[in-house]
A protein has these predicted regions:
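A detector for short metal-coordination/catalytic motifs
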Residues: 67, 78-119
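Short, charged surface segments at domain edges that flank catalytic/cofactor-binding sites
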Residues: 2-39, 98-107, 111-114
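Histidine-centered nuclease catalytic patch
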Residues: 39-74, 80-92
Length: 119
């Protein structure tokens, strides 16, 4: 019983954090992010449904915005949880440098495209 109540409290806390944060990611932006990454941002798989993953977790002050969201496969998203991304990549023995280089390039492209888009 205690486990369920802890899970319920954690879910309520997460719901409050998400509701309190400024989350301005639109469906069109999410589609553009998925197209730019062409698969999981972490492991590169292109199979399955991609989930929205915050590079900086919501619990650490992250938000659902163009510059913080990447597509992640289910296993990577569940494994990363709310860990710091570079430490998690090292532990999983994934290519940290490749991720960071792609993240910076794709993020800049998406932000530039959004700057030119009408509001």
């Amino acid at each position: 019983m205690a486990v369920n109540s802890r899970r319920a409290r954690a879910a309520r806390r997460r719901k409050r954090r998400v509701a309190a944060a400024v989350n301005d990611l639109t469906d069109a932006q999410w589609t553009a992010i998925k197209a730019a990454w062409n698969g999981c941002a972490y492991c590169g798989t292109t199979t399955g449904t991609m989930q929205r993953d915050c590079v900086m977790a919501i619990s650490r002050g992250g938000r659902y915005t163009v510059d913080n969201v990447v597509p992640a496969c289910g296993p990577c998203n569940a494994s990363k949880c709310n860990d710091e991304v570079t430490g998690w990549l090292r532990r999983k023995r994934l290519d940290e440098r490749l991720f960071l280089e792609r993240y910076v390039r794709i993020r800049a492209e998406l932000l530039a495209a959004n700057a030119g888009a009408p509001s």
